[in-house]
């Protein structure tokens, strides 16, 4: 097999995941790969010259983000153009806090009046404030639990995947993933969530129970705007309604209806939402399993633990039916033959040669890219471009010599 990633470059993929053991150069590889794709135009008959820049979005799913360090540029939870490649490459770092601080969780920390609460009596306002404070405390507990919940990193990343699953703006999404364990949980989420939804929705009476619970919440929070009333034909009178008798007829009713409508959920809405999520997850799963749309690039170094974990990762990817036929072996000690021997280099080369032989035997039907150990850090677009060159062209120490990725001072 060709020892480069040129096949990926011309495969018209939509998603590429880059993963492996921690500390093997996943971020450098994913950033270089994103730079390579962003600088390779794609065919477009509607564009001048028949080509246009490929629009690439690089997403870091690792809780310990490094994209900002690799590009010497600060990124956040939203796509930000990469300096020097503004037309073709954007990057973002998924933050689980954004997921736990979303609209749903924020609403639980206390609903605010829209101004109509001024028509309430002092007693009603006090009662409404008491109900709101109670739910605010519950919401605070739920938010804290969500922030510390095991798996929240994977769920927040999956939420971003769902967000971009139907977008047509980007031609390619590249995921700089977390170490192997996190990544495997992320890739298993579509199957896990689909199975969970099926089991939950098969429970008789679950949707009516959710509907009843939402009505209870709506009844209490409805006190902010007045009596809850029968806005949806099923909500009962709020317990705080007797204290509103002093208000003029109809005052606060519009606010009450608006307040409760935010919280009352019907059984049909529950089923419809569950079905929508189920269909979206099936679409994500279909993309994961389509080798023409999704590919996984494994990154490792020529050492026992890394090679062992790479084999485990490849086996798990096969289990989930996710295409993977590319492996990047980083940090190889490769010296020109004219260089005098070095005791330390020779020792490292001996160890690496042992594991490179195993890699060649295990993955003879893979594209195995062998990348050299560099004397400088790979930081910034110019350095990443130099590094990316050898993802599509085999590196030879005798031909290319040492690679200086940083500009001389």
Swiss-Prot record:
It is found in: Cytoplasm; Endoplasmic reticulum. The keyword Cell cycle does not apply. Keywords: ATP-binding, Cytoplasm, Endoplasmic reticulum, Hydrolase, Metal-binding, Nucleotide-binding, Transport, Zinc. One of its GO terms (cellular component) is GET complex. Zn(2+) binds at residues 342, 345. ATP binds at residues 21-28, 303, 330. GO terms for molecular function: ATP binding; ATP hydrolysis activity; metal ion binding. Its main location: cytoplasm. CDD domains: ArsA (cd02035). The active site is at residue 62. It comes from the Eukaryota. It holds the Pfam family ArsA_ATPase. One of its GO terms (biological process) is tail-anchored membrane protein insertion into ER membrane. The keyword Phosphoprotein does not apply. Transmembrane segments: none annotated. Its EC number is 3.6.-.-. ATPase required for the post-translational delivery of tail-anchored (TA) proteins to the endoplasmic reticulum. Recognizes and selectively binds the transmembrane domain of TA proteins in the cytosol. This complex then targets to the endoplasmic reticulum by membrane-bound receptors, where the tail-anchored protein is released for insertion. This process is regulated by ATP binding and hydrolysis. ATP binding drives the homodimer towards the closed dimer state, facilitating recognition of newly synthesized TA membrane proteins. ATP hydrolysis is required for insertion. NCBIfam families: GET3_arsA_TRC40. PANTHER family: ARSENICAL PUMP-DRIVING ATPASE ARSENITE-TRANSLOCATING ATPASE (PTHR10803), ATPASE GET3 (PTHR10803:SF3). Belongs to the arsA ATPase family. Homodimer. This is ATPase ASNA1 homolog. It comes from Leishmania major.
């Amino acid at each position: 097999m060709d020892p480069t990633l040129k096949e990926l470059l011309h495969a018209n993929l939509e998603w590429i995941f880059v993963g492996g053991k921690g500390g093997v150069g996943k971020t450098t590889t994913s950033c270089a790969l994103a730079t390579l794709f962003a600088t390779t135009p794609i065919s477009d008959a509607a564009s001048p010259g028949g080509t246009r820049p490929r629009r690439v979005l690089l997403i870091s799913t690792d809780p310990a983000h490094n994209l900002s360090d690799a590009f010497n540029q600060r990124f956040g939870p939203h796509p930000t153009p990469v300096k020097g490649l503004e037309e073709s490459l954007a990057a973002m770092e998924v933050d689980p806090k954004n997921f736990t601080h979303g609209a749903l969780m924020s609403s639980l920390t206390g609903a605010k009046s829209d101004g109509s609460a001024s028509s309430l009596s002092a007693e009603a306002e006090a009662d409404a404030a008491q109900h709101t404070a109670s739910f605010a405390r519950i919401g605070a507990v739920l938010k804290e639990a969500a922030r510390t919940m095991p798996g929240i990193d994977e769920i927040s990343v999956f939420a971003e995947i769902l967000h971009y699953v139907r977008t047509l703006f980007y031609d390619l999404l590249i995921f700089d993933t977390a170490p192997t364990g996190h990544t495997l949980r992320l890739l298993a989420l579509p199957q896990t969530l689909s199975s969970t939804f099926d089991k939950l929705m098969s429970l008789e009476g679950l949707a009516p129970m959710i509907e009843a619970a939402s009505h209870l919440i709506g009844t209490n929070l409805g006190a902010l705007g007045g009596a809850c009333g029968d806005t949806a034909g099923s909500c009962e009178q709020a317990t705080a309604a007797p204290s509103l008798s002093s208000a003029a007829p109809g005052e606060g009713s519009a606010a009450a209806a608006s307040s409760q409508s935010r919280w009352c959920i019907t059984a049909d809405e529950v089923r419809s939402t569950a079905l929508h999520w189920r269909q979206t997850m099936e679409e994500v799963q279909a993309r994961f399993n389509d080798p023409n749309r999704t590919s996984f690039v494994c990154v490792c170094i020529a050492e026992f633990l890394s090679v062992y974990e790479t084999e485990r990762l490849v086996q798990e990817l096969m289990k989930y039916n996710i295409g993977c036929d590319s492996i990047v072996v980083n940090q190889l000690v490769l010296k020109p033959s004219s260089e005098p021997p070095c005791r330390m280099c020779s020792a490292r080369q001996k160890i690496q040669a042992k594991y490179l032989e195993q890699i060649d035997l295990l993955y003879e039907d893979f594209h195995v890219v062998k990348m050299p150990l560099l004397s400088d850090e790979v930081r910034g677009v110019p350095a990443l471009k130099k590094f990316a060159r050898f993802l599509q062209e085999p590196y030879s120490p005798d031909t290319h010599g040492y690679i200086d990725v940083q500009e001389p001072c």
